[in-house]
Amino acid sequence: IADINEGDFVLDVCAAPGGKTFHAADRLKGAGKVLSRDLTEYKTELIEENKDRMHYENVEVQQWDALEEDESLLESVDVLLADLPCSGLGIMGRKNDIKYQMTEEQLGELAALQRQILSVVWKYVKPGGQMIFSTCTLNKGENAENIKWIEENTPLHLVSIEEYLPQNLKNRTAWNSRTPPRTNAAFSAAGSPAASPPTS
């Protein structure tokens, strides 16, 4: 759903194991760059292994805490991919233990962590750029409520992703859409900087 074009600078802030990074790199067709970051050495090594195995020249991998602001990236990114840590409730079909281990308190902590990351990374999006916020959960607190938070606390505004969706998902809001039985569920939203910051 990201509007990635040749020559773009793409930042993937929570990237491991790298699937979105490499899809973005393919979309660039060799004319642009993907900066692929994650928190731990283990995760960045996973991305590096996949990068080397698939021979991507336009991907740079860095170990970086998404909660730490990188001033060198402010307003420089064409497309920001923010597939953030979440409860994973949309993939219980293949990770059945999630429903037995996840608590209400943990759900709240994950939603708060997402907001903390979003409060840092949205600043990297250049005017006219795009941020994709996504999770693999259907928890309203991690999805719809965080979209509301973005709109109230940043100059980003929602943009339509309908043209990228299959017909059966068009004209529906992401947080109340049902997916077919025995499939995984996910949430995605796209935002671009508004002409001026919101007023309080």
What residues fall within each predicted segment?
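S-adenosylmethionine
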Residues: 1-200
